[in-house]
Amino acid sequence: KEAASHAFEQLQYLKSLPNILLHINQILYKGKLAEAEKMCRDFLKKDPKNTEAMSILSEIASRLGYLEDAEFLLENAVNFDPNNSELRKKYLIVLRKRQKFSKAMLQAEYLCKTFPKNLSFKAQMAIEIMQNGDYEKAIEIFDSILKKAPNDPNTLTSKGHALKTFGKNIPAIESYKLAHTAKPDHGEAYFSLANLKTYSFKTSEIITMKNQLKNINLLSKDRVYFHFALAYALEKEGEYEEAFSHLEKGNEIK
């Protein structure tokens, strides 16, 4: 019930946003960062405390590698709207990227205490525990989440990361494969397999990745993951020119 209520609140929140912010989100979805950034900055000049605009601008900053700016924007957004759980989650993720693990843990603890049945926030807590080196505890939490949501690709991928770091590559591979079986356009799962540096993709998996890149609705982050995974897979097959092409395309989007 709590998860459904949270989802309903988020839907109502999105419906309440100005049309211009929804439009900027669509532009960002298409990977047009420069255009989205300009429009977002112009909007913030008129409404400097709009937390959704700050959140969008932080996403752009994060994609461009300006994590300090992203953190600053989200910290202020959370201060302006402390009850917005999604803002806190985004703030937590940026803190993690900046390796500010103690601050990230505080945000995870707050979210889990405030929304004890929210599986997404529980997964964020597991990731923070993993970052602190307690891989067994993190895997236990991921497993508890998967009992309730067995096909959640993000949790399966995160569990794979924990298993990999814990030195259990075979179970990690299984977890990554379950993730991309559950959601074929989940590029991170394929990239994670490539990132093992020991995995050999099957021909069918290479074909699947190429087909996913033909999907015009594929998220830009997933597109990057697929290009990089294909670069690894094709290089291993001796298709060096095609592999380099995918590497270039991935870097262009990134």
Predicted regions and their residues:
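Alpha-helical solenoid repeat scaffolds of the TPR/TPR-like class and their adjacent stem/linker regions
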Residues: K1-K254
